[in-house]
Amino acid sequence: MLPAPRAAPVPASVSLLTLNGEAPLVRGLSLVSQAPGEALAWAPRTSCPGENTSSGRKVSPCSLDISDKLFCSACDQVFQNHQEQREHYKLDWHRFNLKQRLKNKPLLSASDFERQSSRGDLSSISGSEDSDSASEEDLLTLDEERAESEKPNRPPGFYPHRVLFRNAQGQFLYAYRCVLGPHQIPPEKAELLLQNLQNGGPRHYVVLMAAAGHFAGAIFQGREVVAHKTFHRYTVRAKRGTAQGLQDAQGRASRSAGANLRRYNEAMLYKDVRDLLAGPTWSKALGEAETILLHAPRSGRSLFFGGQGAPLQRSDFRLWDIPLTTRRPTFGELQRVLHKLTTLQVYDEDPREMVRFHSPETHCKPVREERKRDTEKEKTKVPSDANKALGQDEEPLKQGSESQEEDGSEVELELVELTLGTLDLREFEVLPKRRKKRKKKERSQKQQCGAHGPLLQQPQDEPFSQPTQVVATPLDTLVDEAKAPGQPELWDMLLAACRAGEVEVLKLQLATGPVDPGVMSLLSAPLGSGGFTLLHAAAAAGRGLVVRLLLEAGADPTVHDSRARPPYTVAADRSTRNEFRRFMEKNLDAYDYSKARVPGPLTQEMEARQATRKKEQKAARRQREQQQRKQREQEEQEQEERRRFAALSDREKRALAAERRLAAQLGAPSPPVPDSAVVNAGRCWSCGVSLQGLIPFHYLDFSFCSTRCLRDHRSQAGRPSS
């Protein structure tokens, strides 16, 4: 094996926030052109079969060797130190590329991974399925960004989100474009970028991040944190990683308590973030900020855009997407992102030259022709049945062997045998549980259709044909009798109408003229998944009018599903259950209602009594609330009077009491009091509590509610004389 390449020199790091126009580092700056025509050529590398250098590149079998250098062969990244390398190995991007390499699939760059993960094209490493219906404007923006980032013949060392400068000392500076000014600065006006860099870039930053129920935002004035806030709400389904809103948008809305809690938390998170950003501090900061950095997946962008009073606008030139792979939104992550973006990398040499000379070469080990033939024989030993089960054909193997024969350099990796040894594990990835369920459903439909028609065109060794013919129950007989060549479409139409509450569609099939015998056979047939009938589906969806129509048409409420539940027990609400009771009141002898678990008939007199009782309860509740409101007002008024009386001095209290005694002796009305709150002089001299209904304690001319207040007042009165 050839010697490993030496590591690239570590660039110096300088904070953009500490620079000024007089710093030697920024003197004589000029923008370095990175046009593809002016870029350096790629360094010669040892070619290996299967290598591709495009953005969606395939990993070369020769790049599977292990190196102790500061380089990641899966992501094609060079690191400055071991700490940065360890941090890279924890990223979802690195783990995703590892899985792609094990599956022999194309790898993604950091920018492609960010765009596809935010759009929802990729499931996360933990198994989430994040997808959302984006607007047309967002999709067009993503397409433009993808076309810009996937331009052919991109030179080495070129980064679309970074700008390369050169100073008078011959040093090269890499700076992130998002901290050098707004979008509206065109590329031809390079002097504006140079001026922003020499001035240390913008000083007012607002960084916002949101993902998976987490929100974090901070306002920075240079390095100083002016304000920051984080929120966390439980919005992501456990063991699934899918947000509840995305699950509902896909038409699989759940009615569980956890789903309702997640929907409530999504609404509260939306309200909390909107209220925070609409506050005086944050709204002023968003208006004065020179740069706004944002990171949010496609499903989380509604927190910031759209709707009434949106805090951000998509056309804002100050708004930038964070061009980094981020972790969970926290205050520490916000500080790390801003520190990373405002750090300049200073090189003594041209970084494009460094990429050329320090790019890791592919190390391949030559092998003998005999060993190559043995390996090809092992590949051809895989049986055809196994290849079919794994979704593979023999043609890729033949093409691979022909390409290796045509290649003049006979090279191969030692890990080829390990790759062949793990092919049997891919069977579980190709055939997941969901696909098995679909196959069972398709087989049952094919078998039912085949009972009344010609035999299906299947091979004789079909593994599932024999067991399905052996199992025969009365339920299967009912299904077979109900099924006809056109019945599956009719069943799907009726089921969709029951779930959606389309009463008019059902009336066309049930209420006009004689009912079709095919439709009658489907009314009580448990044909759905889980043994649901049409009555089950309508009751579970809370469609009371549909339930009434089906019962009047002849649907049997005593038919149970696979979990022994009649339609009444799966009803969504009370109004739907009342439809069964109203039907029972009109048709007492039609069915065995104890088997249907209907508790009893519901007459009009019972409904009238219930309505009257509800009105009385509502009136009593309204009266009780009014009394409680008056009592609270009286208590608040008493507390205010007590506080004001206790705040008076002893001289003012004596004067007020003397005026009231004099007015009482003369029989004249009480003199007006300046403060309308102090209207009762019969209060405790110490704490101000009303003495009405109490036996007061006296000493001298003072009255108190308790001996404790008397003792406190006496000690305070005797304190100056002591």
Curated annotation (Swiss-Prot):
ANK repeat placement: 489-519, 530-559
Stretches of the chain forming a coiled coil according to its record: 602-655
Species in which this protein is naturally found: Rattus norvegicus (Rat)
General function of this protein: Endonuclease that cleaves polypeptidyl-tRNAs downstream of the ribosome-associated quality control (RQC) pathway to release incompletely synthesized polypeptides for degradation. The RQC pathway disassembles aberrantly stalled translation complexes to recycle or degrade the constituent parts. ANKZF1 acts downstream disassembly of stalled ribosomes and specifically cleaves off the terminal 3'-CCA nucleotides universal to all tRNAs from polypeptidyl-tRNAs, releasing (1) ubiquitinated polypeptides from 60S ribosomal subunit for degradation and (2) cleaved tRNAs.
GO cellular component, one term: cytoplasm
SUPFAM superfamilies, A to Z: Ankyrin repeat
Residue spans, zinc finger C2H2-type: 70-94
GO molecular function, one term: RNA endonuclease activity
InterPro entries (alphabetical): Ankyrin_rpt, Ankyrin_rpt-contain_sf, ANKZ1/VMS1, VATC, VLRF1/Vms1, Znf_C2H2_type
SS bond partners: none
Quaternary structure and partners: Interacts (via VIM motif) with VCP.
Any single GO BP term: rescue of stalled ribosome
Residues with Phosphoserine modification: S256, S359, S529, S676
Active-site residue list: Q244
Entry's EC annotation: 3.1.-.-
Domain free text: The VLRF1 domain mediates binding to the 60S ribosomal subunit.
Designated name of the protein: tRNA endonuclease ANKZF1
Region (Disordered): 109-139, 357-412, 434-466, 595-650
Modified residues (Phosphothreonine): T603
Biased composition range(s): Basic and acidic residues: 357-382, 606-650
Biased composition, class Polar residues, residue ranges: 457-466
Keywords: ANK repeat, Coiled coil, Cytoplasm, Endonuclease, Hydrolase, Metal-binding, Nuclease, Phosphoprotein, Repeat, Zinc, Zinc-finger
UniProt feature, compositional bias: Basic residues: 434-443
Gene3D superfamilies on file: Ankyrin repeat-containing domain
